[in-house]
């Protein structure tokens, strides 16, 4: 009798749970059909999947196995893979060393080498431990502690831990010169970007550069920015390429604007070497040689040298928090290449992306065609990932020991924990939501090639996703 009662209780709970799931599925279906009927989309341009976070059971799906451009929602796959393969406590180490010898007068007959590890946070202002001036001062102090008063060699930024191709395949040329298109170096510095403020003039007249946050005196900056009407805002774009010696600024800067525009730095490793040389000179240490980046030196051979000091990055969990909260593309490219380097000893973005694809094929049997990754950030419009693949990887994360750190890294948007993605004609959201019935849900929603304004489509997507809260 007791067995019969317990069995009846179990099946009653199961029946109620299934009823909730069916009810939610019906609501999502109705909302999705309404979403599509409002115009601006075809059947093939919208994909949605919703599943139970604990069991993986699919609650609703539409076009979930169609490859879609993801924009920055791809960052969740990079984040989860990094947590899984590198660990929450992983840290990068940057080493400064010297070659040659130091004589009794304090002359170093050799070079100072800054050996990069791909750390994307070095010199970033997001963490107390990574502030650029503090790092320069610490290294300068360590050099002086060795009794070095003059360096008869060079200051070299060694960025050779990666392949030197800073920009992944498929990134639009118009993006590369701007802060969000900053390429990844083996020795990143100040998030590989520089801030510029302008002095507006009469409408249509040149807007002069007022201030630079970084010393770019070694570059040729061609400024073609004009003053725009009040209220027109920031329409300034930077144009450059990795390792270039010049930057072109075009567009308009609103007459009433008071804003810092950020552009990418063509050679971050050189910038760091340049800044350290300047800091040493300011502190009384003479440097006879030039600042240089390893990739631009002919026949550079890395030397072990004698260690002067090391710098450790924040933990991976701390890096991924800002990576997802502020959608920093540089962080994604550094993490992807780091995964490839640590797991497979490869240096390129393509090889690293292929390793990530192979990992999820082996771990979750996700077809390789469902994970068309060309970068780690989602900036490439040519990325193609199915909603099902992204959803399965996110659902997998729910059971992992580092899940709390990943969940914390997701922004709160529309009162939901999810990562957004936006590039031309593409909007996406991927995240987690608990329904009123207490069911924990994982979801991925993409729209591609939509018509109408981004703001309007975003609100329509929020309205659809709000059903998951019911």
Model-found features: residue ranges?
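Small-residue-rich helix-loop
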Residues: 59-61, 311-314, 326-329, 333-470
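Conserved serine DD-peptidase/penicillin-binding transpeptidase domain
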Residues: 35, 85-367
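Residue-level preference for non-acidic, small/hydrophobic
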Residues: 56, 75-82, 155, 187, ...
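Short, glycine-/Ser/Thr-/acidic-enriched flexible segments
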Residues: 21, 55, 119, 162, ...
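Short active-site loop at a secondary-structure junction
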Residues: 61-81, 85
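Bacterial Sec-dependent N-terminal signal peptides
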Residues: 1-26
């Amino acid at each position: 009798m007791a067995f019969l009662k317990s069995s009846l209780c179990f099946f009653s709970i199961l029946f109620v749970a299934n009823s909730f799931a069916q009810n939610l599925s019906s609501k999502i279906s109705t909302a999705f059909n309404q979403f599509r009927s409002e115009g601006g989309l075809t059947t093939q341009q919208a994909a949605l999947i919703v599943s139970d976070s604990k069991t993986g059971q699919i609650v609703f799906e539409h076009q979930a196995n169609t490859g879609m451009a993801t924009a920055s929602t791809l960052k969740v796959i990079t984040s989860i893979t990094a947590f899984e393969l590198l660990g929450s406590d992983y840290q990068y180490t940057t080493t400064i060393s010297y070659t040659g010898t130091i004589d009794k007068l304090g002359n170093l007959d050799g070079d100072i080498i800054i050996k990069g590890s791909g750390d994307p946070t070095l010199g970033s202002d997001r963490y107390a431990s990574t502030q650029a001036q503090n790092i320069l001062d610490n290294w300068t102090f360590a050099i002086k502690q060795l009794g070095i008063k003059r360096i008869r060699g060079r200051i070299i930024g060694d960025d050779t831990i990666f392949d030197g191709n800073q920009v992944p395949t498929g990134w639009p040329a118009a993006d590369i010169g701007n802060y969000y298109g900053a390429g990844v170096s083996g020795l990143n510095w100040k998030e590989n970007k520089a801030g510029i403020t302008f002095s507006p003039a009469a409408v249509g007249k040149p807007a002069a550069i007022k201030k630079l946050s970084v010393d770019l005196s070694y570059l040729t900056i061609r400024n073609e920015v004009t003053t725009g009407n009040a209220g027109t805002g920031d329409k300034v774009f930077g144009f450059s390429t990795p390792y270039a010696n010049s930057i072109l600024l075009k567009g308009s800067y609103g007459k009433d604007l008071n804003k810092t525009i950020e552009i990418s730095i063509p050679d971050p490793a050189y910038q760091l070497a340049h800044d350290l040389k300047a800091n040493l000179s300011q502190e009384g240490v003479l440097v006879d040689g030039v600042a240089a980046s390893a990739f631009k030196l002919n026949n550079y051979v890395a030397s072990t040298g004698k260690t002067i000091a090391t710098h450790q990055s924040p933990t991976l969990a701390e890096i991924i928090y800002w990576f997802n909260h502020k959608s920093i593309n540089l962080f994604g490219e550094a993490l992807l290449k780091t995964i490839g380097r640590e797991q497979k000893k490869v240096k390129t973005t393509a090889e690293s992306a292929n390793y990530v694809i192979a990992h999820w094929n082996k771990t979750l049997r996700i077809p390789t065609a469902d994970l068309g990754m060309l970068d780690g950030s989602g900036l490439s419009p040519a990325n193609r990932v199915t909603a099902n693949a992204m959803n399965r990887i996110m659902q997998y994360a729910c059971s992992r020991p580092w899940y709390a750190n990943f969940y914390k890294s997701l922004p709160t948007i529309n009162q939901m924990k999810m990562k957004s993605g936006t590039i031309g004609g593409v909007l996406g959201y991927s995240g987690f939501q608990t329904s009123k019935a207490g069911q924990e849900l994982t979801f991925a929603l993409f729209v591609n090639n939509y018509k109408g304004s981004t703001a309007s489509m975003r609100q329509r997507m929020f309205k659809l996703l709000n059903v998951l809260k019911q």
